A protein has these predicted regions:
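Short Pro-Cys-Gly-centered "Cys-loop" motif that presents a nucleophilic cysteine in a tight turn
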Residues: 1-75, 84-251
């Protein structure tokens, strides 16, 4: 390097040095919402065969890892999974395998090796309290296609757990595990009903930040226990305090 020349880190190198990854909750028997999106929000599932291929990968992953799939929905450019790992660290291992396997097969099918990433980043996740908050998240996930205007009724979306749950018996590959708590009565009708503004804002905030989703006491307790306190703090720089000064009188 010549004298006076500045060494510039690539964006990825800078991110690795300056922006350490936030902690992630990944404990056995916890319940987690996991999400990933196509790179630059690009379409990942272009046709029916793409959805079928991903569900096949999900089935393979569920056989390979000690983890349960409780709820899911595949959308054209992203997917939602609600999972319960049975071993510590199994959520991350499962999601890493799912993402890597799907990326490899996607590139092989579309002949796009070397043309960029399929997903925009590593998956996002947040822990969920196993009570009515779990049911809210499942309604949020299972009505995703309805909210996006892709169907008129949530149960019409073929690529998700609501449609699959309504089929008797469940089609192969078998993906869904029993829920830890009972569904609300008239579950399909409840999924078709919109979440209220408070519920929507809370779920989206937790998905964005990795913040535990539950009542205030549970969320704060879990954040402390799992070293997720940073997810509970307000984002952005603190506001500057404006100090009113008295004008100096000339003598």
């Amino acid at each position: 390097m010549k004298r006076g020349q500045v060494s510039l880190l690539s964006c990825r190198e800078w991110y690795a040095v300056e922006m350490p990854r936030p902690p992630r909750a990944d404990e056995a028997f916890g319940i987690y919402h996991a999400l990933n999106r196509g790179n630059l929000r690009a379409t990942v599932f272009h046709k029916e065969g793409d959805y079928v291929a991903f569900e096949k990968i999900l089935g393979e992953g569920l056989e390979r890892y000690q983890i349960e799939l409780l709820c899911y929905q595949l959308m054209p450019n992203h997917y939602h999974l609600v999972l319960r790992p049975l071993l510590d660290g199994e959520l991350s291992r499962f999601m890493k395998w799912i993402g890597g396997t799907h990326t490899m097969r996607y590139h092989a099918h579309y002949h796009t090796q070397g043309l960029g990433h399929v997903y925009q980043q590593r998956f996002k996740s947040f822990p969920i309290q196993c009570d009515e908050h779990f049911l809210v998240v499942c309604r949020y996930v299972e009505r995703n296609a309805l909210r996006a205007g892709l169907v008129d009724q949530a149960e019409q979306w073929r690529w998700g757990s609501l449609w699959r749950w309504l089929q008797k018996p469940e089609p192969t590959p078998k993906l869904l595990s029993a829920w830890p708590i009972s569904r609300l009565p008239n579950w399909t009708q409840r999924v078709n009903e919109a979440l209220n503004d408070k519920e929507m804002e809370a779920v989206r905030r937790c998905a964005h930040r990795g913040q535990p989703y539950g009542n205030d006491e549970w969320a704060e307790s879990e954040a402390r226990r799992m070293n997720l306190e940073s997810t509970m703090r307000p984002r952005g720089r603190p506001k500057k305090l404006l100090i009113k000064q008295n004008p100096i009188k000339e003598t």
